[in-house]
């Protein structure tokens, strides 16, 4: 009898403590779930789009702003035999992140028709890639390509757009722009110097006169990349900028919506140049600055 009583007491002790432990674990789980819920709510605060990806807005983050010469040095090193990227790979990574950011910020139902102005250099190539991805996302895309690049890489990008039924036109007028909900400026990137020349000066003026929302790729076309002056007399007045690799000195004081896209700088380059890169979250290819 005494042995049976002792066994019963032991079982009750285990049961009571198990219940307490279970209650404690439930409390912890509830607390953590609540915290996660808050984080998710903050991540999705603002506009909802047809995209499923999220972005965390980080405040007071450390980020390196690149001079024109350092940006060129890093770009060359990324495509060196030592690192091993190709131009095509970098364009695909950049173009996809551009498309994802646009998809996040400009909902499909309000900004379905997009006109993308592409320049003759790699910035324009990023725009051509973004056009293809945006088409796949369901947007109605037109590319304006006033000065076509005849290199094989760019011809392949144009051929892909043809197979995705994306119209590519040589020019667009102010009246043409009125038909679109959003304009993307992929004319000039970080290698641009001097003042925009014809036909790009007219295009920039036309974009600014359109009163349409404008997104710039890497930098607003026409600005001084090093930011040591107010910029050129004529530059794109965009409402959002998508920096690539790292932001450039010319957009250090950019006070409108600003993203960093691409996520392709390897650790060795970060360490070599002591770069400060904002923390990307999860599988996101971009972060809001």
Swiss-Prot record:
Cofactor: K(+)
Record flagged with keyword DNA damage: no
EC number(s) from the headed UniProt entry: 5.1.99.6
Enzyme class: isomerase
CC per GO annotation: mitochondrion
Signal peptide: none
Keywords recorded for this protein, A-Z: Isomerase, Metal-binding, NAD, NADP, Nucleotide-binding, Potassium
Domain named YjeF N-terminal: residues: 71-277
SUPFAM superfamilies: YjeF N-terminal domain-like
Name of the protein: NAD(P)H-hydrate epimerase
Natural source organism: Plasmodium knowlesi (strain H)
Biological classification of the source: Eukaryota, Sar, Alveolata, Apicomplexa, Aconoidasida
């Amino acid at each position: 009898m005494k042995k049976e009583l002792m066994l019963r007491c032991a079982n009750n002790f285990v049961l009571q403590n198990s219940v307490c432990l279970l209650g404690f674990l439930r409390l912890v789980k509830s607390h953590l779930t609540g915290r996660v819920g808050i984080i998710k709510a903050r991540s999705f605060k603002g506009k909802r789009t047809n995209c499923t990806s999220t972005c965390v807005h980080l405040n007071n983050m450390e980020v390196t702003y690149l001079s024109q010469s350092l940006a060129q040095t890093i770009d060359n090193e990324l495509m060196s035999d030592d690192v091993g990227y190709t131009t095509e790979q970098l364009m695909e990574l950049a173009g996809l992140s551009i498309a994802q950011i646009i998809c996040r910020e400009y909902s499909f139902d309000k900004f379905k028709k997009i006109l993308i102005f592409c320049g003759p250099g790699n910035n324009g190539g990023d725009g051509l890639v973004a056009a293809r991805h945006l088409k796949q996302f369901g947007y109605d895309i037109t590319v304006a390509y006033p000065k076509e690049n005849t290199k094989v890489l760019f011809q392949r990008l144009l051929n892909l757009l043809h197979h995705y039924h994306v119209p590519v036109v040589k020019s667009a007028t102010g009246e043409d722009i009125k038909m679109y909900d959003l304009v993307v400026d992929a004319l000039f990137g970080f290698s641009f110097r001097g003042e925009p020349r014809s036909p790009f000066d007219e295009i920039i003026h036309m974009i600014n006169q359109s009163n349409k929302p404008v997104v710039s790729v890497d930098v607003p076309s026409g600005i001084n990349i090093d930011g040591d002056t107010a910029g050129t007399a004529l530059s794109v007045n965009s409402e959002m900028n998508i920096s690539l690799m790292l932001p450039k000195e010319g957009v250090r004081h950019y006070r409108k919506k600003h993203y960093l896209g691409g996520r392709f700088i390897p650790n060795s380059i970060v360490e070599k140049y002591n770069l400060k890169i904002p923390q990307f979250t999860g599988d996101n290819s971009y972060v809001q600055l």
